[in-house]
Amino acid sequence: MAKKPGENTGKNGGIYQEVGPRGGKKDNFATVKDNERLPPTTKPGNGWVLDKRTPDSKK
């Protein structure tokens, strides 16, 4: 399920890949920290899917 731009990542920060409205993958990636908002997409209607989750900090 794709997340919309501006949605909070919660505890799932990592590398997100842009996908089209029907799920086709685009060549646009974004690195987003935990509890941050997702950036805008290149076209309206596109979303973001988690490609690689970053590990939690041990602090």
Swiss-Prot record:
Disordered, as annotated region: 1-59
Feature: compositional bias, Basic and acidic residues: 24-37, 50-59
Record's protein name: Uncharacterized 6.4 kDa protein in sieA-mnt intergenic region
Organism: Salmonella phage P22
